[in-house]
């Protein structure tokens, strides 16, 4: 199915950014504390990577069912019961939150692109509008994951 393949591909691609982000953080720390060099642009790039990883992988983690949850209510329950609880909670909590985030972020993203928003830091990156565009990844991937699970588990 295309949704499943897309979610898996996006999640695996984005997860490859984690070692890159870690290496860049080490470079920033070494440059600052051993050589006294501040790398503002690189620090902001790491923030961009962090946003990309967090917002882009949310749907993948939800799809894999590896997200953090409190299982005290249903850890010993049957799989069908867990599926029903997950479906109901996703329908009444996840989807509305995703729609609100998606709806209200569109104006923010549009304004950021219109003014070509740049960093307020000296030596910062000139692409804040690209970082703000990443916000929309979260609701999109979460809604796609919900749609896949609805089709796969409920209508199979």
Give, region by region, the residue ranges found by the protein language model.
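Alpha-helical transmembrane segments and membrane-interface helix-loop junctions
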Residues: 1-156
